[in-house]
């Protein structure tokens, strides 16, 4: 009975967090819907999203966002223990990057963890091998992760499981952010976008 009670509590907590997270993301990122192909509003409505950050990469080296300047980048926030949406999104990004590179569009994929406690540089280095070889994976301390997620309007919240300090999940928003060569936010999107649609962004660039 106690175990069933704990499971029920966890389900209720996760449902509440998902609801709050969805509301947060909708309020932070919602913009009028526009047709995708050929009609991107690149700096959509001048929403204040993104900004400079300093984290630690998968090699244990300090990584400053200035290193991305001169390149387009795709930034995704998640965590290595994520069972489904994160690997699905990273595989999608891998496919997009491959196609863009084939079309001579230089773009760097970036994975930023929202679970710095477990996602050390060593853990990230092994995990990111499953995806595009150009991926940069980043972690940091709690303050650094809070800073960069605030700048990108990313929602995330830890959900405890049986009070185990290592056995927990993280509920988080799941958008990919397209950043231009000057480090400016261009667009955010979910899994329903193609490399062709992204290429439409650069027709008049």
Swiss-Prot record:
GO terms for molecular function: metal ion binding. Pfam families: SCO1-SenC (PF02630). It comes from the Bacteria. InterPro entries: SCO1/SenC, Thioredoxin-like_sf. SUPFAM superfamilies: Thioredoxin-like. Keywords: Copper, Metal-binding. Cu cation binds at residues 82, 86, 172. Belongs to the SCO1/2 family. This is SCO2-like protein RP587. It comes from Rickettsia prowazekii (strain Madrid E).
């Amino acid at each position: 009975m106690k175990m069933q009670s704990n499971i029920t509590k966890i389900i209720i907590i996760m449902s509440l967090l998902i609801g709050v997270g969805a509301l947060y993301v909708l309020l932070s990122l919602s913009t009028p819907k526009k047709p995708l192909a050929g009609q991107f509003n690149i700096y959509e409505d001048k929403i204040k999203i993104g900004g400079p950050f300093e984290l630690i990469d998968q090699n244990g080296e300090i990584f400053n966002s200035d290193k991305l300047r001169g390149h387009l980048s795709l930034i995704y926030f998640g965590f290595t223990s994520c069972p489904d949406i994160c690997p699905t999104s990273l595989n999608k990004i891998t496919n997009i990057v491959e196609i863009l590179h084939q079309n001579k569009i230089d773009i760097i994929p970036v994975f930023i963890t929202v679970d710095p406690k477990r996602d050390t540089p060593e853990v990230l280095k092994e995990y990111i091998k499953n995806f595009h070889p150009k991926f940069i994976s980043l972690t940091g301390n709690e303050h650094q992760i809070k800073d960069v997620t605030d700048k990108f309007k990313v929602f995330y919240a830890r959900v405890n499981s049986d009070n185990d300090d290592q056995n927990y999940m993280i509920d988080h928003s799941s958008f990919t952010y397209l950043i231009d060569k000057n480090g400016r936010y261009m667009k955010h999107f979910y899994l329903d976008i193609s490399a062709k649609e992204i290429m439409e962004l650069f027709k008049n660039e």
